[in-house]
Amino acid sequence: MTNQPLTLAEKVWRDHIVAAGENGGPDLLYIDLHLVHEVTSPQAFDGLRQAGRKVRRPDLTIATEDHNVPTIGVKTGDLQEIQEPTSRLQVSTLRDNAKEFGIRLHSMGDIEQGIVHTVGPQLGLTQPGMTVVCGDSHTSTHGAFGSIAMGIGTSEVEHVLATQTLPLKPFKTMAIEVSGELQPDVTSKDLILAIIAKIGTGGGQGHIIEYRGEAIEKLSMEARMTMCNMSIEAGARAGMIAPDQVTFDYLEGRPHAPKGADWDAAVEYWKSLRTDDDAQFDTVVHIDGSALTPFVTWGTNPGQGLPLAEAIPQLEDFTNDNDRLAAERAMEYMDLQPGTPLRDIKIDTVFLGSCTNSRIEDLRAAADVLKGRTVADGTRMIVVPSSTRVKMQAEEEGLDQIFIDAGAEWRTAGCSMCLGMNPDQLAPGERSASTSNRNFEGRQGKGGRTHLVSPPVAAATAVTGHLAGPADL
């Protein structure tokens, strides 16, 4: 086994097998980090309670309040700041469960509070070679560090809480090779949207994707997190990028990163986490990164996307009957006509936020476009940092004032308008340009229409009132 060439995913998987599966059964994997939030955990804790079990490794479990929290009016973190009764109950329940089971919790008002997929990396909890799980599909974000990170269901959350293990069958492996160098106006969000448009929302089904190549190696850690975050939108179980000096520089000095001799030993191990030269992937996809331009979605799934310079496709462009029917339904829901230039689509609300694109680099990129400009009449812009730490850093850099001066709303940290589960929602028929990850029907509010975009495109769109890129200003 040790002499067989392995992919990155296979190496991490191998190092976490507690008990190998027999006769095609699942392997039992050890879980290094379990992230918890208020929405998918209540029933899991109830299951523990009913069975008389404790949390096996509370030291490897961390909880945050993110999905249901408001982004306006949060001052102390008191439960009464949550107006919606169900949301307030879920947050209250998480606080009670964390206290009862001895789990570290970052609540509203806590300096470390934020979206769980930002909090893990910024604290240095997410590290190369780990297995990371959370009851949230965008756990794949953490794969940017060279970890196997995946979303799990509530019953699996209970299993990990009780045993710190998870039974899983090995997944297929896919390499997405991105050659060349991205153009200055092209971001990792444009790249991942282009990839999903190419392979489809089911293209990665049953696979762990490893993003490789020159364009990937030149991405910052935050840009890599955006890539891995949206792996699930291509149908993949997880996404990974091999750790390198960019990874090590990001982690060094963070609160939970190894220190001293432990750091040196960790880096030596992390350097081994690369796909062997002769390792075989089940699927390989090639992308020319240098040929990409800003990319946006027009439909109701992340695979229905096009370069910003293009127009809504003609129905006859779809040779597959299912794709054509899906496109027809998407155009009807989105109230769009074939042949309409994407730049002609008027936008009511611009949302800069979510675990995909509201880290400090994203806020800087949008602020660079907005500086000295104003949000168009008839358009509103909401800016929601992904964590309290990100918010504080942005304010130290004066980014908040750039947004406020432009006429945008500067909010506190949370998942916000990414999903219709808190007060930040679209009205029926309202159209958004959003830096989030899903454009499903009703995702941002019943009847809301969502176009997925990068932070620079979001900012340019806010200024013009229609889909636009910085080059259009």
From Swiss-Prot:
Catalytic activity entry: (2R,3S)-3-isopropylmalate = (2S)-2-isopropylmalate
Swiss-Prot/TrEMBL GO biological process terms: L-leucine biosynthetic process
Name under which the protein is recorded: 3-isopropylmalate dehydratase large subunit
Cofactor(s) the protein needs: [4Fe-4S] cluster
CDD domains to which the protein is assigned, alphabetical: IPMI
Binding sites annotated in the UniProt record for [4Fe-4S] cluster: 355, 415, 418
InterPro entries: 3-IsopropMal_deHydase_lsu (IPR004430), Acnase/IPM_dHydase_lsu_aba_1/3 (IPR015931), Acoase/IPM_deHydtase_lsu_aba (IPR001030), Aconitase_4Fe-4S_BS (IPR018136), Aconitase_4Fe-4S_dom (IPR036008), IPM_dehydratase_rel_enz (IPR050067), IPMI_cat (IPR033941)
The protein's Enzyme Commission number: 4.2.1.33
Keyword ATP-binding: no
Pfam families documented for this protein: Aconitase
Family in the record: Belongs to the aconitase/IPM isomerase family. LeuC type 1 subfamily.
Function field: Catalyzes the isomerization between 2-isopropylmalate and 3-isopropylmalate, via the formation of 2-isopropylmaleate.
Annotated GO MF terms: 3-isopropylmalate dehydratase activity; 4 iron, 4 sulfur cluster binding; metal ion binding
Quaternary structure and partners: Heterodimer of LeuC and LeuD.
Recorded superkingdom: Bacteria
Pathway(s) served: Amino-acid biosynthesis; L-leucine biosynthesis; L-leucine from 3-methyl-2-oxobutanoate: step 2/4
Gene for this chain: leuC
Keywords: 4Fe-4S, Amino-acid biosynthesis, Branched-chain amino acid biosynthesis, Iron, Iron-sulfur, Leucine biosynthesis, Lyase, Metal-binding
Source species of the chain: Corynebacterium jeikeium (strain K411)
Cofactor note: Binds 1 [4Fe-4S] cluster per subunit.
Spans annotated as Disordered: 423-452
